[in-house]
């Protein structure tokens, strides 16, 4: 009698509940949104750097050309250097477009926090107190997903407000030190605490997107 060859059996993955699937999808969305934010931020910094360099260069030329006059440098900038004015306007439009892109991302982050809160409330409604039910994945209580989402969303909301200020002020700044300060703020994103990536990676690990 011929021996039958058994096929390789692949262990089935545990079936996730509706709430767990939604939380896992949200974690992936967080990862994608943050990557998109970083890409836009890098492009925005390059644009902001060009604006700052142009303003500093223009201011230096005006100071030399108008050394003997009583007019301020910025008063004659557009008249004396119309080509700079056109290029500066284009760069400012690019930076504004970047800001609008970041704003859309932050709005999606807010929505993620809202949907995560909804999942937590649904779990509470169906299963009662958190301490009396098992976690959706490994160790995190359901409410912790909302806490992390809310914290991340607040960080990016504050950072967006700072970037809006930079966009509004940078093109009107002729002072070199102030322009460099604005650039530093944009690049280093002070409201995005060092722990933001740790929060994201912890959430990805908990939901199974990352493995130890």
From Swiss-Prot:
Keywords associated with the record: Acetylation, Cell cycle, Cell division, Coiled coil, DNA damage, DNA repair, DNA replication, Nucleus, Phosphoprotein, Ribosome biogenesis
Post-translational modifications reported in the UniProt record: Phosphorylated by CDC7 but not by CDK2.
Major place of residence: nucleus
GO biological process: cell division; DNA repair; DNA replication; ribosomal large subunit biogenesis
Coiled-coil region: 74-106
Record's keyword annotation contains Cytoplasm: no
Example of a GO cellular component annotation carried by this entry: nucleus
Localization per Swiss-Prot or TrEMBL: Nucleus
Signal sequence segment: none
Sites of Phosphoserine modification: 69, 73
Gene Ontology molecular function: any one: preribosome binding
Statement: the UniProt record of this protein carries the keyword Acetylation: yes
Modified residues (N-acetylmethionine): 1
Disulphides: none
Subunit structure: Homodimer. Part of the 55LCC heterohexameric ATPase complex composed at least of AIRIM, AFG2A, AFG2B and CINP. Interacts with AIRIM. Interacts with CDK2 and CDC7. Interacts with the components of the replication complex, MCM2, MCM3, MCM4, MCM5, MCM6, MCM7 and with ORC2-containing complexes. Interacts with ATRIP. Interacts with CEP152. Associates with pre-60S ribosomal particles.
Family the UniProt entry places it in: Belongs to the CINP family.
Purpose: Component of the DNA replication complex, which interacts with two kinases, CDK2 and CDC7, thereby providing a functional and physical link between CDK2 and CDC7 during firing of the origins of replication. Regulates ATR-mediated checkpoint signaling in response to DNA damage. Part of the 55LCC heterohexameric ATPase complex which is chromatin-associated and promotes replisome proteostasis to maintain replication fork progression and genome stability. Required for replication fork progression, sister chromatid cohesion, and chromosome stability.
Protein name, per record: Cyclin-dependent kinase 2-interacting protein
């Amino acid at each position: 009698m011929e021996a039958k060859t058994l096929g390789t059996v692949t262990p089935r993955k545990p079936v996730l509940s509706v709430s767990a699937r939604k939380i896992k999808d949200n974690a992936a969305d967080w990862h994608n949104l943050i990557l998109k934010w970083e890409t836009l931020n890098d492009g925005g910094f390059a644009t902001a750097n060009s604006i700052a360099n142009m303003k500093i260069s223009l201011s230096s030329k005006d100071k030399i050309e108008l050394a003997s006059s009583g007019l301020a440098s910025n008063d004659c900038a557009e008249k004396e250097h119309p080509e700079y004015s056109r290029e500066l306007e284009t760069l400012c439009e690019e930076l504004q477009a970047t800001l609008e892109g970041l704003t859309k991302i932050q709005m999606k982050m807010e929505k993620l926090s809202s949907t995560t809160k909804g999942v937590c409330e649904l779990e509470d409604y169906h299963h009662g107190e958190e301490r009396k039910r098992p976690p959706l994945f490994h160790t995190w209580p359901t409410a912790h997903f909302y806490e992390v989402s809310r914290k991340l969303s607040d960080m990016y909301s504050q950072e967006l407000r700072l970037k809006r200020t930079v966009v509004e002020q940078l093109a009107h700044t002729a002072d070199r030190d102030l322009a460099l300060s604005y650039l530093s703020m944009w690049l280093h994103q002070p409201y995005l605490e060092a722990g933001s990536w740790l929060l994201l990676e912890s959430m990805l690990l908990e939901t199974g997107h990352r493995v130890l």
